[in-house]
């Protein structure tokens, strides 16, 4: 019998959990993080489920595994893990992992104040501000983000005909604005979103295909972003992002904020240099900015940046014991 040990640091970014795996993960094959992610999914997805699912995790758990970079221009590599799979990119996960890796001395940037990260979605640059030994804030320059499709429609059980735009900010998002079928965040409950979101994602996923123009390994609709009027006086918009099977992001969501900024830029609401303050379902804020315009294939895109904060909550040495019948974790679902 074998017991696998993983050395983790737990924390949260603006309210959403982050579990950083600092030791115990396997070496991965591949020339880049896309290939290494594929190897991990083929051979080691039990690590993701074991660390993210109950009884060691929970429905909202997400995290990242630290690896040496595959690119000469990067300081470190992140492999993102969460209940829904291995995401190409995770904004809140990057902010949290950067904060904890720096505060614990697990990475030394070549340029003080800047950490360059190798991810399956590409190079992500993180600029951070320190206060003594602590990281006050992290601003990440995300991958090029773009509006993929507008005005898509699908019949969703319990809602009827729903219209949505789909945008990419590191993951594909169905962005649902207030309409006849959805009155807006301020008029629904979190339990409504948990009930509707899987149905909406399935309905749109069956009817349409979503494939990154330059990286076909990134495909499929993984997230649903519900919108509403802001409550915080500094915010431009409020959102609740659904991911996995039963998770609503407690943070404003980094890749979701990037996708929303791409949508607004395509609509002419944002330009280079424009700020965009995004409010989460619990009232925390990410501060976005359009850094540049770009092209992804034939699609117009933006290069967004997002600033947020994170805090470490503790160390966690986790065992996955082969004797444990629940070693790979479990999720409680309605059809159980």
Enumerate the predicted regions with their spans:
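A glycine-rich beta-to-alpha transition motif near the start of alpha/beta enzyme domains, typified by
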Residues: 1-165, 174-336
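Glycine-rich ThDP/TPP pyrophosphate-binding loop and its adjacent helix/strand module
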Residues: 170
